[in-house]
Amino acid sequence: RYWSAWPFGAVLLPSVALANTALVPSPPSINADSYLLVDFDTGAVLVEHNPDLQLPPASLTKLMTAYILAEEVALGRLALDDTVRVSRNAWSQNPVFKGSSLMWIEPGKPVTVAELERGIVISSGNDATVAIAEHIAGSEAAFVDLMNRYAEEMGLTRTHFENSHGLPHPDHLST
């Protein structure tokens, strides 16, 4: 008539022990020269591989261009309905842009800041980045200086821009 707890303990104790054990998966196999995964809530680095390796940012450069455009609008120095003059340098037929992503803008044809913003973000238009860079800073070179100042203020100490679009340049690098 005695009831033994032994069978229940044999089943229950391992289950409780497993429930309290955090299962941490091994890092995924990623075919990349560099990566970094950070927990959004805690800021803890979950997995990394060569996080300080400088690589060409390519079209990720356009994120900084679009960010500066948005900042200029937020500060009231630029309006989305402003008309931009497209230079021959920003023209889609510029040989620098051959074979690259374009918005297909032309000199002498009116284009608004909003259209250029869409051309940068949606079409990844290299011509659109130069047009907005020239409109904001007077020249692409002056805009690149602005990009590098923003990068420094953001703590992107190993990022250096050489153009507004991300086409290859040996010194156009980021981590």
Each language-model region and where it sits:
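Bacterial N-terminal signal peptides
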Residues: A5-S15
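Active-site-adjacent loops and short helices of periplasmic peptidoglycan-processing enzymes
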Residues: A19-T175
